[in-house]
């Protein structure tokens, strides 16, 4: 305050009739301006807090385990961008007997179509075995099951936003940071397919497998565990971006990305200690 030029000028003006009233009004405005300027840099920090890794969940038919994980991630208190797939050649759902499954095509058959068909075939059977409840959940999450091998990384997915798919916001660019499969054979299929696709984007992606038995009860537990793993990974990514900046992140390089990649094995090991009944695998692959 003693160094404020307005106060010194007010001191020189003491003999004159206009006394020091002018200095007090500007004084708060000066400090107010300083506070505003100090508050502005905090805005980017808030935006970095809202950073979200993009996830992909995968099971055999994109029906039970991957969709429970899709639900958990897309409807979390702080939702994640998420897409989901199956790795099978066809979508297979239980039928009246083991030798009579209900079989559908990926990408062209909606969950609503499956629901209506099974409802018409035998409502009592498919209500009791949980298929109708599962399909009802699925059709409220996205349009229909997609096959992982048909996915082209980097191809825009804007139509999924317009369809109202849960978790679609943030995935419009057709890329993900993390893929989580729910069965080892699905993990093998994903890793093999990524190699066959040739890494056209040269973008790193962490591929995990969380081994979940294919029933509704185990899928519920597995979905909760996958959400926790996703949250731990996202917290670490956010920390590294705050420390090192986000430069190069989207291209899969930069100091923040390198530091995050190095932390992933430790994060998985810590998570596995809490979920010992869900054996996990991990590798780094490329889109």
Curated annotation (Swiss-Prot):
The broad enzyme category this protein falls into is: hydrolase
Entries under Pfam families matching the protein: Ssu72
Principal location listed in the UniProt entry: nucleus
Cystine pairs annotated here are none
Compositionally biased spans, kind Pro residues: 15-28
Which residue ranges does UniProt annotate as crossing the membrane? none
Q: Which UniProt keywords apply?
A: Hydrolase, mRNA processing, Nucleus, Protein phosphatase
Instruction: Write out the function statement from the record.
Output: Component of the cleavage and polyadenylation factor (CPF) complex, which plays a key role in polyadenylation-dependent pre-mRNA 3'-end formation and cooperates with cleavage factors including the CFIA complex and NAB4/CFIB. Ssu72 is required for 3'-end formation of snoRNAs.
Listed under subunit, the entry gives: Component of the cleavage and polyadenylation factor (CPF) complex.
Question: What is the official name of this protein in its record?
Answer: RNA polymerase II subunit A C-terminal domain phosphatase ssu72
**Organism the protein comes from:** Aspergillus fumigatus (strain ATCC MYA-4609 / CBS 101355 / FGSC A1100 / Af293) (Neosartorya fumigata)
Q: What is the lineage of its organism?
A: Eukaryota, Fungi, Dikarya, Ascomycota, Pezizomycotina
> Gene behind this chain?
ssu72
């Amino acid at each position: 305050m003693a160094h404020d030029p307005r106060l010194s000028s007010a001191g020189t003006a003491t003999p004159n009739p206009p006394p020091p009233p002018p200095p007090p009004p500007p004084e708060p405005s000066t400090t107010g301006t300083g506070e505003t300027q100090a508050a502005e840099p905090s805005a980017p920090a808030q935006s970095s807090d809202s950073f979200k890794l993009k996830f992909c969940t995968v099971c055999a038919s994109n029906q039970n385990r991957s969709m429970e994980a899709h639900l958990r991630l897309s409807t979390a208190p702080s939702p994640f961008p998420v897409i989901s797939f199956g790795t099978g050649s066809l979508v297979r759902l239980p039928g009246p007997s083991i030798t009579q499954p209900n079989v559908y095509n990926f990408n062209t058959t909606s969950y609503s179509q499956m629901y209506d068909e099974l409802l018409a075939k035998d409502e009592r059977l498919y209500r009791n075995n949980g298929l109708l409840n599962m399909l009802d959940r699925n059709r409220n999450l996205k349009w229909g099951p997609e096959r992982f091998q048909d996915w082209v990384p980097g191809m825009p997915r804007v139509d999924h936003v317009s369809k109202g798919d849960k978790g679609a916001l943030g995935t419009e660019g057709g890329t993900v940071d993390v893929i989580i499969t729910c069965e080892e054979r699905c993990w093998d299929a994903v890793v093999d397919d990524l190699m066959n696709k040739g890494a056209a984007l040269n973008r790193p992606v962490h591929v995990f497998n969380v081994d979940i038995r294919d029933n509704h009860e185990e899928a519920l537990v597995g979905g909760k565990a996958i959400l926790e793993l996703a949250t731990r990974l996202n917290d670490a990514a956010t920390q590294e971006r705050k420390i090192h900046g986000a430069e190069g992140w989207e291209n899969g390089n930069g100091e923040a990305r390198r530091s995050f990649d190095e932390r992933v094995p430790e994060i998985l090991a810590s998570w596995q200690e809490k979920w010992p009944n869900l054996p996990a695998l991990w590798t780094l692959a490329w889109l």
